[in-house]
């Protein structure tokens, strides 16, 4: 597979963000720094590592798919999310609970949609970062990002739980939560060559 120069830069930006995450604690401030690294090619410098100050809508070829949380509510929603993450990091949870909460953090973050761009990349990084904080460094090798890319239509279908932040139906989130575990199983079940 050949990559264009911009794609090479985006990959390098992601590698920088993941390297940063592997050597820093999972905090809201550090997530903003990681976003600054991963979105360098995506956004103007003034928007890097900063919550958006305008409404965003997610569109597909079929039209508007999702209206994100209003910008005036982002700081509060992110404080609440990171308060929950902090509590989970301090608590004793088992392996299955760690995967459940990591996937749920990913999903909630995507629904908050705090940045002008790079939200999916930041959500996948946040998911992995949380898992590593609970289970150790070996989690950085879990191929979840590749699995999500290989199943991108399913990924977007499973994220879609409502038309806007206020109509999200988390009772329908189980198919999305299962994708993280399936990313592990897909590699275990691959035939050896």
Regions found by a protein language model. Give the residues of each.
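FIC/Doc superfamily catalytic core
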Residues: 1-193
């Amino acid at each position: 597979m050949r990559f264009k120069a911009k794609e090479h830069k985006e990959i390098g930006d992601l590698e920088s963000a993941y390297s940063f995450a592997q050597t820093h604690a999972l905090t809201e401030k550090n997530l903003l720094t990681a976003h600054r690294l991963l979105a360098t090619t995506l956004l103007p410098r003034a928007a890097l590592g900063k919550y958006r100050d305008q409404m965003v809508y997610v569109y597909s070829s079929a039209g508007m798919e999702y209206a994100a949380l209003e910008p005036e509510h982002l700081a509060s929603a992110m404080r609440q999310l990171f308060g929950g993450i902090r509590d989970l990091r301090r608590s004793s949870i088992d392996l299955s609970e760690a995967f459940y909460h990591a996937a749920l953090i990913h999903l909630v973050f995507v629904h908050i949609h705090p940045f002008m761009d790079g939200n999916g990349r930041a959500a996948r990084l946040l998911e992995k970062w949380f898992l590593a904080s609970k289970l150790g460094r070996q989690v950085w090798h879990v191929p979840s990002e590749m699995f999500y890319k290989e199943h991108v239509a399913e990924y977007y279908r499973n994220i879609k739980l409502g038309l806007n932040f206020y109509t999200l139906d988390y009772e329908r989130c189980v198919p999305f939560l299962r994708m993280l575990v399936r990313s592990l199983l897909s590699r275990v079940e691959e035939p050896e060559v």
